[in-house]
Amino acid sequence: MELQKGRPKYTADRLEKEIRTYDLLDKLGVAYERVDHEAAMTMEVCQEIDKVLQATICKNLFLCNRQETKFYLLMIPDTKVFHTKDLSAKIGSARLSFTKPEYMEKFLDITPGSVSVLGLMNDTENHVQLLIDEDVLKSEFVGCHPCINTSSIRFHTSDLIEKVLPAVNHDFIMVTL
């Protein structure tokens, strides 16, 4: 694995949703670095990628309430333990659970293993509320997938908050877990 600046030079074998991610970041003037890798399906693999990226790789959890009427994307450091009961109480929601894959595709155009804050660019009707753990906000860089789990990127957390989220018309709620 090798850290590279910006978008891939050759994009013929890349999915359109990945290219749209790079297009968005480039349009916003967000500097980012990228590493290509085998599919990252576990946090253990992500931790190896983290060593190359030198960024906080987040657990990105796609959650919903019992009625499947409210949807949340939670970003927490990979080192934190997640308890649905605690988060549900903090945001005043009925007990949260993991969302069905079809909602991931419908709202974020992503599949399990590729969940990313950058998927919010596809949520044009704001079905998903972003929740960010305070420790993620304290990190200089955030690491995430460009809507596909065979690449990972890092960029300044401040760019996420100040450029990316406003551009995709999403705000966030800070949580302490």
What are these regions (language model features)?
Residues M1-L177:
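Extended, low-hydrophobicity, polar/charged segments
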